[in-house]
Design a protein with these regions (language model features):
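Short, structured interface segments
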Residues: 169-195
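Short, solvent-exposed, polar/charged sequence segments at loop or secondary-structure edges
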Residues: 49-53, 59-60, 66-122
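Bacterial N-terminal signal peptides
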Residues: 6-14
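Amphipathic beta-strand/beta-sheet edge segments enriched in Tyr/Trp
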Residues: 96-157
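Positively charged n-region of N-terminal signal peptides that target proteins for export
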Residues: 1-4
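A structural "domain/chain start" motif
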Residues: 19-83, 147-150, 159-165, 192-197, ...
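Residue-level preference for long, well-ordered alpha-helices that form the structural scaffold
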Residues: 50-54, 123, 168, 172, ...
């Protein structure tokens, strides 16, 4: 009986140890604004603070990093505030890294082909994205990279059957997502290749409050 109890106890300890080792230590990352460095969408009433292309890229990157399960994400939409928060002030929010990005290229292309009994239309979107990873404590850029992505669709009309296809708005998301997907693995590697650390946020009545 004692041997059985000893075996069960050892088994429970092993399972507990395995569960603890299986936990992932997450890095705290602040994502800054993605700027739109292209001419796309910059008309008379263009609002730099609410650029839809930059917001698309930011949302896609945030989603992909969240899906990795390796980060606690802190979204910081004000680039000037991000720059001011390096060093001692950055400890207050406890971020390890800042990720800043830009949409550097964006273009749409429509191509059509007419045949005797059919017409076809090819819609293509190409996008370029660049990112920078900044050490939140030192303010130094530790990594930068860029990538391009493309998405397309083809519609056909046979002898008057089928409507004229308008522009597929989802292609913008798909092209930007394709570009960002090429960068995500390197972002994860660069942000996790250093030992995990935490910050003391405040001391109150002899108790320490630290970032998790």
């Amino acid at each position: 009986m004692k041997q059985v109890l000893l075996f069960l106890l050892s088994f429970c300890v092993a399972i507990s140890s395995f569960a603890q080792n299986d936990k992932t230590i997450k890095r705290k990352v602040a994502i800054g604004r993605f700027s739109n460095e292209t001419q796309y969408g910059k008309g008379i009433f263009y609002d730099k603070e609410n650029d839809p292309l930059g917001k698309q890229a930011l949302d896609i990157l945030s989603a992909k990093l969240a899906q990795s399960g390796k980060f606690i994400l802190l979204e910081r939409n004000d680039l000037e505030l991000l720059a001011a928060e390096t060093g001692e002030n950055m400890k207050k929010i406890g971020a390890d890294y800042l990720i800043l990005g830009s949409v550097t290229e964006f273009g749409r292309k429509n191509e059509g082909q007419q045949k005797v009994f059919s017409n076809s239309k090819v819609q293509t979107v190409e996008a370029g994205v660049s990112i920078r990873i900044v050490d939140a404590y030192t303010g130094l850029i530790i990594y930068s990279d860029e990538a391009k992505g493309m998405a397309g669709t083809t519609t056909k009309e046979v002898v008057g059957i089928g409507g004229q296809a308008g522009f597929d708005a989802t292609l913008s998301d798909k092209a930007i997502s394709a570009a960002i997907s090429q960068l995500v693995e390197n972002i994860i590697n660069k942000c996790t290749d250093k030992p995990w650390k935490s910050y003391i946020l405040s001391v109150e009545d002899g108790s320490y409050i630290i970032s998790g």
